[in-house]
UniProtKB/Swiss-Prot annotation:
CC cofactor: dipyrromethane
GO CC annotation: cytoplasm
Record's keyword annotation contains Transferase: yes
Lineage per the UniProt record: Bacteria, Pseudomonadati, Campylobacterota, Epsilonproteobacteria, Campylobacterales
Name this polypeptide is given: Porphobilinogen deaminase
EC number: 2.5.1.61
Organism: Helicobacter pylori (strain G27)
Sites of S-(dipyrrolylmethanemethyl)cysteine modification: 239
Amino acid sequence: MGNLVIGSRGSELALWQANHIKERLKKECFIESEIQIVKTKGDKILDTPLNKIGGKGLFTKELEELLLKGAIDLAVHSLKDVPVVFEKGLDLACITKRADVRDTFLSVKFPDLMSLPKGAKVGTTSLRRSMQIKLKRQDLDTESLRGNVQTRLKKLECGEFDAIILAEAGLCRLEIQGAKYRKAFSVEEMIPSMGQGALGVEMLKNHKHFATLQKLNDEESAFCCHLEREFVKGLNGGCQIPIGVHASLMGDRVKIQAVLGLPNGKEVITKEKRGDKTKAFDLVQDLLEEFLQSGAKEILEKAQLF
């Protein structure tokens, strides 16, 4: 049998992720593999904010189509990009140990968000980040920032933005300092996206190596990420919707923090639940119920208009 084929997007970060899985497959599963680069819709359309492109799976659909055809054996994703409902026959074979989940502030001139002058331009791809920035600083101008990590940093250095917000995990993986000023938000200051910091490996469920990849699975990270994905699924949300959710374990206890609102920060719901790990999925349902009672569906419908 030939090498397994790993499907990956072509950015430096995506290829770091694919190579990370390739190395672990060889070392831990004794499986040789090769990487095939695939351009997704989200990679091709760079002049439009992600939420305006429309559809789910902007960074995964083309990879999933190749999985279903058998043209590739596995697809490596940033888990935060993976839709909560899979195409029939596909599923996550594993979720890797989570890297840093936090979002990070970067600027050439200003040390942190609160030091930015009124009307300063902040670049982000994410409505979730925009919402939480506006919640703290309604006077700031949040604008869409597309492209790979290096492209976004160049736009900051050229003065197109006063500050930008990126995922800390990506900066760490690429060993990028980023800018003169770099400060990670705490989870309490900016609740991350579902699955942020983790990689998800997607395969056909009936693939002969599907179970083998459980060797790469991190039990705690997978448990927390599945809780987060269950919350987003309950709201019919996707990765381009302004929802943040983060689950964490402290021994046999679990904490789930969530935020949802309009990108302009005008209507926002923030709640958290704590409880026994054995009842974690019940806690998610309780949290969902509280969000729905607080008008979550109506807010998400309004958010679609932004």
